[in-house]
Every structure is written in C-alpha cells, then in structure tokens.
Amino acid sequence: MNYTYCERLMWVAIAPAAFRYLARQELGWDISALKQLSKQIYRQMVSRTPDIGSMMENPLRVCLTGGILWLSIYKAAEEKMSEKCFEGMVSASMRSPLVVTAFRGKAKTAFTLKAQYKRAATASLADADRNPFQWNAEVIFGRDAEEYTILYHQCGLCALGRQEGLPHLVPYLCALDTMSVDWMGGRLYRTKTLA
C-alpha cells in the first residue's frame, strides 16, 4: 500500500493511546525509542502490504491500517510483549476519545437501509478482488433497516497476521468489531472468527 492520509491519520489517532498504555505498564521500555522504531516498522509494513483501495473506496482500509500499526509496535518491542499486554494496548487505543467519537458519529447512519445497500455494493466489489488482504463477505438483508447479517469468508487482518508471522495475535484484533459496533449503537453477534 502507499503511505496515504489514512495511514497518517491512524498513527495520530491511535498510536498515542497505545504508547501511553505501554508506558503505564512499567515494562522498562524506552517509549521514545519504541515510538521511533514502531513508526519505521509501520511504514515498512504498509509498503509491503497489498493495497485494498483508498479509505473512501474501502472503509476496511482503516481496520487493516490499525492492524498494521499494532503489529508494528509489537515487532518494535522485539516480540517481548505478552499477548495480554498486546490485547490491552489494542483496547486502550480503540478507547481513545478520537476513535470513540468517530464511531459514535456514525451511529445515525450505520443502521439504515442506505447503509445496508452500500455495504452490499462494497462487499460485491471486494468479492471480485482476489487480493488476500481484501475482506470477502456476503451481506444478508434483515427484517428492517436496523438488522442485517454479514458473513465474512476472508479477512484482511488474518492475511496481515500470516504475512507478518503473527497469526496468534489476530484474535485480539477481532475485538475491534465488537467495540466499534457497540459505539455505533448496534449489537454484534459473532458466531466464530476466521482467525
């Protein structure tokens, strides 16, 4: 992928909360050095990850970029970070005021018939793409505008975990769905994860 405004925005929006969380853990890391190395790894990881379209064409680019950011911090910590610490870092980042506000702002438009049609159109375009980093999904319309089902058959975060040799961390990234849907006023019923 190219390093675009999406990647810059994600770094500004969620990296500070991640580093604040890690600083509070008192694990003896030099947070300043960790930030610098993480940013370098982040840029490298972005450049070696296949493009899935712009943030406007494919909103899931934000999810993929978030995954890249968190895995880059994990790698910068020389993989000495425990899975529990990684999970806490991801959660703390997602709970940053900017992220919560962004998802709550979508609450009025996320569960409408127009949003369902848009998701279905995006899903059909993604399904045609053979890129393993693309989310392939099937949208099933519900009884009304507020209810729908999305069945994912392929996940960009799973592909990212495999690419970086860190598939064991992908389930912690799946928690993002539950938090974000909750902030938009919905309820997510996950029957399984692809990871």
What is each residue range found by the language model?
Residues 11, 46, 50, 54, ...:
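Residue-level signal for well-ordered alpha-helical segments
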Residues 65-163:
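Amphipathic interaction/junction segments at domain boundaries or subunit interfaces
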Residues 139-194:
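Short, hydrophobic/π-rich interface segment
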Residues 28-30, 82-84, 167, 187:
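Short coil/loop linkers at secondary-structure junctions
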Residues 1-74:
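N-terminal, charged low-complexity regulatory/assembly segments
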Residues 36, 88-90, 173, 193:
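Proline- and acidic/polar-enriched loop/turn elements at helix boundaries
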Residues 3, 34, 135-139, 188-191:
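Generic structural motif
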